[in-house]
Amino acid sequence: MRFRWSALMAALTLILMPRVGSAQAAATTTQKSPVAKLEQNYPNPFNPETRIPFSIGGYPTCTDQSHQYKVTLRIYNVLMQLVAVPVIQGGAGNVAGGQPLQNVLVPCGQYVAYWNGNYGNTRKEAASGVYVYALEVDGQKLVNKMIVMK
């Protein structure tokens, strides 16, 4: 059973990871820095809530403070079915705390998303297991996994 979970997570990671073409791989001297950085959620494993830190625009060395990045963060189960859209914790720039991270425009900076462990906007708690969270910033997708343990 453990092997099946490992194989499934490896397959999902390979499917969701951004692909690098051979032309991009050859041009290492002129490669741009990533638009975003997705950190591991904490605590992990968790019950019933977690936080997901991420940074946008090369934070802390933001070169263009006026640029607004289109950000979406989603949580999926292992079948890649949408489970929830976390909310931004606190507030930063022009983004209010508690706002769902779905096509939100944010400036360069460091942020923390909050997920209460429920399915969507319901009070039904997510089942124990592995979940995948995907951050999309201006078309760049970053993926990581987390564990809900009851």
Regions found by a protein language model. Give the residues of each.
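Bacterial N-terminal signal peptides that target proteins for export
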Residues: 1-9
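Bacterial N-terminal signal peptides
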Residues: 9-17
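Sec/Tat signal peptide C-region and signal peptidase I cleavage site
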Residues: 19-23
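Short loop/turn motifs at secondary-structure boundaries
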Residues: 25-150
